[in-house]
Every structure is written in structure tokens, then in C-alpha cells.
Amino acid sequence: MSSSRPVALVTGANKGIGFAITRDLCRKFSGDVVLAARDEERGQTAVQKLQAEGLSPRFHQLDIDNPQSIRALRDFLLKEYGGLDVLVNNAGIAFKVNDDTPFHIQAEVTMKTNFFGTRDVCKELLPLIKPQGRVVNVSSMVSLRALKNCRLELQQKFRSETITEEELVGLMNKFVEDTKKGVHAEEGWPNSAYGVTKIGVTVLSRILARKLNEQRRGDKILLNACCPGWVRTDMAGPKATKSPEEGAETPVYLALLPPDAEGPHGQFVQDKKVEPW
């Protein structure tokens, strides 16, 4: 028996920006908030931390690299809630700048999670999004920087209003293949594997927003990519300028856009403002 209670889900939520987004949604969202994390133990510890603050998130395991794990979460949401109101795709990985893992392996591993994992979550969970639902894909300003460092022909493809999901997948796979062959620089790619994966997330968001316009126009679902800023997390390190709480502001703003909001939709948003892509 599914409850009609609204529900919000945050992925990669056991620490950093994801944890801060979950905390803020627990305070502001009128419904249940599901904290999803790959590691059950760390996820439960994060839930206990929030419970100690008087908040009551629910936990569900989610490894976005594992299609079975995504489907288990989908089934849970359908059974318990009959759908999903807010989806925040925050889970992602990055290698440290000084990591000596070969670049092609960094490219493959980062792409698998940041782009393909996020895409798989969208594939399974977007059909569950209820009318006036909100979807937020956490991208990065690094994607904009990486875009500007791509060869012009690649930039034009990534900025195209008509690029298809299949074409985008082809380009993401080509980047990984080019790194394996050691030709990514001469093929016009930038030197940031993380940056290219986040170009993928931003462009995927534009494509999915367009699909929602075509297939579910009357449902007023808003889907955006955003940059939380340079945030002090395990990923970005201690020198970053924003706290995780400050990093959560834009994702939470997009997750809680009022029901009558016309936009933003299909945009790249930073500091609550639409950035030109």
C-alpha cells in the first residue's frame, strides 16, 4: 500500500554536499526525505547524525554503478510512495589532482559513475516523477571550463539544442576511447576527465528537460543541472571557499521551486542564477 506522502530522494548523501542537501530538505520539504548512499553503514551513520539533530530522514542503499541497486530503489519508491516528487542526483566521484592512476583509467572510472550512473538513475526514476516534480542534477562549473577547452566542433555539438541522448552517449564513449589510445588532446578534448563527465551531466539535463517538454508538457516538472560552487568536501579539499551548507543552497532552491514556477527548466544554474551554457 503506497502512501500519498510526498517524497524527496538525494543520492550520494552520506557526506559532503549530499548530506547538507539532505539536512536542508529534512527541514524545508513537507514530506519524507530518503538519504541514499552506496555504503549501508555510512548511510545509517549519516541518518543517525540527522536524527540527533531532531530530523527524520529514511535510508535506502543505492550504488548508481549497479543497475540492480537502482531498480531496488525504484521498486521501494513505487511500493512506499507510488512515485517520487524530488530527485537530487548528487552521487559522483573525482580523482585527486595528484593521483597517479593512468589518465585513461581515471577517464573510464569517472565516466562510469558520473555520467552513465547518473543517466541510469534518470532512466529508472524519471518515469516515477509526479506532476510538479523537481529533478536536480549536481554538475559543476568545471563542466563550463572543460567545455571552453574543447575543440570548437565539440563545443558546438555540446551546445546544440537538437543533440540526442544517443549522440551524447557516443561522444562520452569516444572521450574514454580517445584517452585509451592516447589521442584525446589531438581529438580536441580537454585534460579534465571530471570536467568532461560533468559536460555530460549538464548536456544530459538539457536533453531530458526537452524530452519532458515533449512527453509530459502538462505535468510542470522542472529539471535542471547546477553547480554547488567550490565546496569544502573530501572531493575538493579544505581550501575551497564554501561550506557544504552553502553548497547545498542552489540544489535545494531548485528542488523546492514553487508548484506554479515556470522555470528554470533545462538550465545550468549557479548561485540561484541561470548561467549561459
Swiss-Prot record:
Intracellular or extracellular location(s): Cytoplasm
Disruption phenotype: Embryonic lethal.
Modified residues (N-acetylserine): 2
Record bears the keyword Acetylation: yes
Catalytic reaction list: a secondary alcohol + NADP(+) = a ketone + NADPH + H(+); prostaglandin F2alpha + NADP(+) = prostaglandin E2 + NADPH + H(+); prostaglandin E1 + NADP(+) = 15-oxoprostaglandin E1 + NADPH + H(+); menadione + NADPH + H(+) = menadiol + NADP(+)
Molecular function terms, GO-annotated: 15-hydroxyprostaglandin dehydrogenase (NADP+) activity; 15-hydroxyprostaglandin-D dehydrogenase (NADP+) activity; carbonyl reductase (NADPH) activity; oxidoreductase activity, acting on the CH-OH group of donors, NAD or NADP as acceptor; prostaglandin E2 9-reductase activity; S-nitrosoglutathione reductase (NADPH) activity
Record carries keyword RNA-binding: no
Key words of the record: Acetylation, Cytoplasm, Lipid metabolism, NADP, Oxidoreductase, Phosphoprotein
Any Gene Ontology biological process: glucocorticoid metabolic process
Principal location: cytoplasm
Binding site for glutathione: 95-97, 106, 193-194
N6-1-carboxyethyl lysine: residues carrying this PTM: 239
Enzyme Commission number(s) from the entry: 1.1.1.184, 1.1.1.196, 1.1.1.197, 1.1.1.71
Database matches in SUPFAM superfamilies: NAD(P)-binding Rossmann-fold domains
Modification type Phosphoserine: residues: 2, 30
Transmembrane segments: none
One term under GO cellular component: cytoplasm
Binding-site residues, substrate: 140
Region spans: Disordered: 258-277
PANTHER family: CARBONYL REDUCTASE 1-RELATED, CARBONYL REDUCTASE [NADPH] 1
Function: NADPH-dependent reductase with broad substrate specificity. Catalyzes the reduction of a wide variety of carbonyl compounds including quinones, prostaglandins, menadione, plus various xenobiotics. Catalyzes the reduction of the antitumor anthracyclines doxorubicin and daunorubicin to the cardiotoxic compounds doxorubicinol and daunorubicinol. Can convert prostaglandin E to prostaglandin F2-alpha. Can bind glutathione, which explains its higher affinity for glutathione-conjugated substrates. Catalyzes the reduction of S-nitrosoglutathione.
Protein's name according to its UniProt entry: Carbonyl reductase [NADPH] 1
Gene (UniProt): Cbr1
